[in-house]
């Protein structure tokens, strides 16, 4: 459901990019949606591992750290929301 939506939207954006038609707003929406989805999904996985999820010996710890930074570099989620909001005239 959410994952399928993310894949479909990323496919649409990839096609638009290769055709030179990807707008900044669409790119911002894609980054915003997929990074927030990634954070929610990896948080649930971390929860399943309990305290082990925070130990560096387990891959889930690295995945959580890597997933968290996705919403920061390249423009924070808040900046992506600003870009989308400008397109909506807000």
Q: Predicted segments — roles?
A:
Residues 1-90:
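Alpha-helical interface subdomain recognition
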């Amino acid at each position: 459901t959410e994952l399928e939506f993310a894949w479909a939207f990323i496919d649409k954006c990839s096609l638009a990019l290769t055709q030179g038609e990807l707008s900044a707003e669409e790119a911002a929406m894609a980054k915003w949606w997929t990074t927030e989805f990634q954070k929610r999904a990896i948080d649930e996985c971390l929860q399943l591992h309990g305290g082990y999820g925070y130990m560096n010996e387990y891959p889930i710890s690295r995945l959580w750290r890597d997933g968290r930074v996705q919403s920061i570099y390249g423009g924070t989620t808040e900046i992506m929301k600003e870009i989308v909001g400008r397109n909506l005239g807000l």
